[in-house]
Amino acid sequence: MSVRELVVLGTASQVPTRHRNHNGYLLRWDGEGILFDPGEGTQRQMLRAGVAAHDLNRICVTHFHGDHSLGLAGVIQRINLDRVPHEITAHYPRSGQRFFERLRYATAYRETVALTEVPVAADGPLAVTPAYTLDARRLSHPVESYGYRLTEPDGRRMLPERLAAHGITGPDVGRIQRDGSLGGVALDEVSEVRRGQRFAFVMDTRLCEGVHALAEDSDLLVIESTFLDEDETLATDHGHLTAGQAARVARDAGVRHLVLTHFSQRYSDPEEFGRQARAAGYAGELTVARDLTRVPVPKRR
């Protein structure tokens, strides 16, 4: 059975707390797993969440600050220790190549798994598969940072009443889907476009064009909200977003489910992030992330 969900492994920002691990997010997309921003302690969080190294197919790093990348060393070594039977692909800013190599080879271990490095150097597609296209967009942060967007190809939804009106039943339904027409009836006449699902991952950044482009029409948006609104100046100075800013991005982009995360340790009440997001006018589904939370990708409309 296909599963599309986000598994939150960690939600802290610069430093972990007693209740929050450094960043880490696994997107399950049918039979594939994409690990985003594995911070320190991600390998242990994977164990707690029931995520195996075998579940991973891609690793996407937004930038090389420690809370988004220090877990790479342990995760990569675990992939090799467990002899994952498939290739792993890693995406990260090309400008951080030296950091990736230091983390990949932080200590001695036996390499048993092919890990393909596909660094990001500009906006655009990184991978095109039958299941999705993975794109990157530049963000605005003191070090080079990219956000990621996964887009499923549009499909077709067959309309039973139109099929019946044209007398198309049984195996003929498959034939018209495959061939595009049947007996003078075009596929467009008996079906409609089923928009593919869209997922966006936006970490450390100020407001910028890339944030809006990544979020546009997303079914599920995972976005940093390091600061509360009263600290907006501090957020901008350090290259981050507030809860209200993140919520307005989601509101204006038509996001269906907003996940706020990457919280500063200075705040004791995480629910205030949710209250400020609602006050900013976001009316869709909202999750203030906690470690080990699972968030399903919203069902297709």
Curated annotation (Swiss-Prot):
Task: Quote the record's binding site residues for Zn(2+) 2.
Answer: D67, H68, D204, H262
Annotated Zn(2+) 1 binding sites: H63, H65, H141, D204
Cite the entry's keywords alphabetically: Endonuclease, Hydrolase, Metal-binding, Nuclease, tRNA processing, Zinc
Q: What's its top-level EC category?
A: hydrolase
- Could you give the cofactor binding note from the entry? Binds 2 Zn(2+) ions.
Stored InterPro entries: Metallo-B-lactamas (IPR001279), RibonucZ/Hydroxyglut_hydro (IPR036866), RNase_Z/BN (IPR013471)
Q: Per UniProt, what is one GO molecular function of this protein?
A: zinc ion binding
Q: Name one Pfam family in it.
A: Lactamase_B
Please state the Enzyme Commission number of this protein.
Answer: 3.1.26.11
Q: Where is the active site?
A: D67
Query: What does it catalyze?
Result: Endonucleolytic cleavage of RNA, removing extra 3' nucleotides from tRNA precursor, generating 3' termini of tRNAs. A 3'-hydroxy group is left at the tRNA terminus and a 5'-phosphoryl group is left at the trailer molecule
Q: Look up the record and name the cofactor or cofactors this protein needs.
A: Zn(2+)
Instruction: Extract the NCBIfam families matched here.
Output: PRK00055.2-3
> HAMAP family per the record?
RNase_Z_BN
Describe the protein's quaternary organization and the partners it interacts with: Homodimer.
**Family as reported in the entry's similarity comment:** Belongs to the RNase Z family.
Tell me the function of this protein: Zinc phosphodiesterase, which displays some tRNA 3'-processing endonuclease activity. Probably involved in tRNA maturation, by removing a 3'-trailer from precursor tRNA.
Q: What is this protein called?
A: Ribonuclease Z
Q: Which organism is it from?
A: Streptomyces coelicolor (strain ATCC BAA-471 / A3(2) / M145)
